[in-house]
């Protein structure tokens, strides 16, 4: 089983959704400030995906990756960007996901030169100018998904291998939905994730 779910953060972080899906103990752990809404929305989405109202606090394994204490056989990963949240859930080993809203970023050419492999940089350079920014986000999300599946830190983007061809033993897939770029990395084949996408709305809760 491999599920990929996306949703808007505001409706998934309402007081009603939070009270229904998150336990008091988990709600007590919520951060304050600008991270709060995305934190709540991600956990509401996770609770809905596993069918657990009153989701208990998550625990962490020896490598620092969170897991569900009542469903330890399920691996999951959350990502958020500019008002949207994504969840990948699997019962077949570790997963990683990344979602980014395709948007201008003044420093993206220098980031690509610093982080991407020569192969990736050559691919970007060969594209028409208008296609380079979306391709940058495609490479970026694939790298993030790979590193998150491995449990690596974001700074290790600099050390990740080229991701045009995934490393042996893992599978990478990505898709674009309107202005969103989504990538998933899993231990099992995950091609055509665009066809797997589920959308979680307030009405579904």
How would you describe each model-predicted region?
Residues 1-205:
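Core catalytic alpha/beta fold that binds nucleotide/phospho-ligands
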């Amino acid at each position: 089983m491999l599920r990929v779910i996306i949703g808007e953060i505001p409706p998934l972080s309402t007081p009603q959704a939070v009270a229904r899906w998150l336990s008091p103990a988990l709600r007590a752990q919520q951060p304050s400030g600008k991270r709060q809404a995305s934190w709540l929305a991600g956990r509401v989405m996770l609770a809905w995906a596993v069918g657990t109202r009153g989701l208990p606090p998550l625990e962490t394994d020896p490598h620092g990756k969170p897991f569900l204490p009542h469903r330890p056989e399920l691996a999951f990963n959350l990502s958020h960007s500019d008002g949207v949240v994504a969840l990948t859930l699997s019962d077949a080993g570790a997963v990683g996901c990344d979602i980014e809203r395709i948007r201008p970023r003044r420093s993206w050419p220098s980031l690509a030169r610093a982080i991407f492999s020569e192969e990736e940089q050559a691919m970007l350079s060969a594209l028409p100018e208008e296609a380079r920014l979306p391709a940058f986000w495609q490479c970026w999300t694939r790298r993030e998904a790979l590193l998150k599946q491995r449990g690596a830190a974001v700074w290790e983007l600099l050390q990740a291998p080229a991701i045009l061809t995934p490393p042996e033993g893992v599978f990478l897939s990505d898709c674009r939905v309107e202005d969103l770029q989504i990538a998933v990395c899993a231990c099992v084949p995950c091609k055509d994730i665009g066809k797997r996408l589920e959308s979680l709305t307030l009405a579904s809760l």
